[in-house]
Amino acid sequence: MLGIWMWADSLAARGTDRVFDDCGQMGVTDVFFLTKGLSGLCAFSTRLAPPMHEGRDLLDEAVSAAHKRGMRLHAWFTSAQDKRWVAEHPEKGLYHLTKGCSDHIVSIAEPEYAEFIHDIVSDVLAGYQVDGVHLDYLRYNHLLYGWSDSDMDRYRRQGADAVYVRELVNKTFYGGEEDRQAVFDAYRRGDKDVLALAEARINNVCRFADTVLEGARFARPDITLSAALMPEGAYDTAFAHLHYGQSYARLGKRFDMILPMAYSLAYGMDSAWVGKVTQGAVRCGARVLTGLHAYDGATGLTLKHDAEAALGVNGAGGICLFRYGTFVSAEVKPGRLAVVNPTDVHVTELEISGAAETHRIKALIPPGERMEVPLSFAVDTLRAWSDEKEICAYLR
């Protein structure tokens, strides 16, 4: 499988057919299409939220274009981030330990918000033949969040000494250098209060997921349910359980497919780390599509090595690129290389390499345009530049 995350704005900027033609040339099998974003706006017609683009049903366009080209279309929803909903329900924002209530992050423990997302997803499934439902931001975003009076009560009900764990978290993030691992070390040595804190956060995330997924399964038993997960949970349970409330083991039982966001450059990591994340994710039991760093900071070489590392793991299901519009793509055809530039910068130079030779080619490929380059050898690597800056490139 080759997946790609896609912002709805891409259709408005480039045109739906051109965008999906580009995906077809890349060999994309699965498109994860942003259907409800961080702003709270939606890419489809619903009474529950305003549209991203007035007068256009971008989800309908995307489903039609994907199916016409034999691709699967997954409706992608940002879960616990919704600026519009928090503006209407300010008391439901996620509460920071020292800074107070967020104006854009929703508390994932709020049943009212879970029901809202359930209803949004139900609207999509009732009106559109999407192939999947994809949940993102299915988490607390940091251990410093989740400290309202209601949150403290939830931790107490789980059996935690809420005052003690709050003080331990404060010590970890605002104490001295020697305290930087205090709460995580407590988890690892089996501190019952810290374990209860983690359990409460995991349960809140799982309850949110269950509310949405049960409705989706009832409406469409054949639907593919997937989630984008933070990468640390594949190998560091203390970190993921406490920070995010994400348990790969438990979420893997709820979803058909998980997408660990193994964005190597964002974490200062290499391709070996991508393989480590993929290997840990595979153990959770769900199908794994590893999310790769294909946006600013990545290059043709880093993406190639990350993809090889992910695909080299036994049991891995494929890769998913973040995101359409941030990298150049190319397809090898008989005697030529077909290059597409969906980015917002001019491509000025390409480097094409095979086993025995490398060619640097001066090229001018404006945003949204294509170019064909004659080929006389087998290509295995593509790199691209915009003036002095190297940009990401994907070679099919």
Predicted regions and their residues:
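Terminal connector regions
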Residues: F377-R396
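Glycine-rich, aromatic-flanked loop segments that form ligand/cofactor-binding clefts
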Residues: D30-F32, L58-K99, G132-R139, D222
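Catalytic domains of carbohydrate-active enzymes, especially glycoside hydrolases
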Residues: G15-G40, G127-G132, L251-M257, A310, ...
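Substrate-binding cleft of secreted/luminal carbohydrate-active enzymes
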Residues: R254-W273, V277-G280, V288-E331
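Aromatic- and acidic-residue-enriched segments that line the glycan-binding/catalytic groove
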Residues: S45-H53, Q81-S102, Y137-A186
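Aromatic-lined carbohydrate-recognition surfaces of secreted/lumenal glycan-active proteins
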Residues: W5-W7, H74-S79, H134-N141, L168-V183, ...
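Active-site-adjacent "subsite" loops/lids of carbohydrate-active enzymes
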Residues: L11, R72-Y128, Y145, D185-Y187, ...
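Aromatic-lined substrate-binding rim segments of carbohydrate-active enzymes
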Residues: G37-Q81, L197-A219
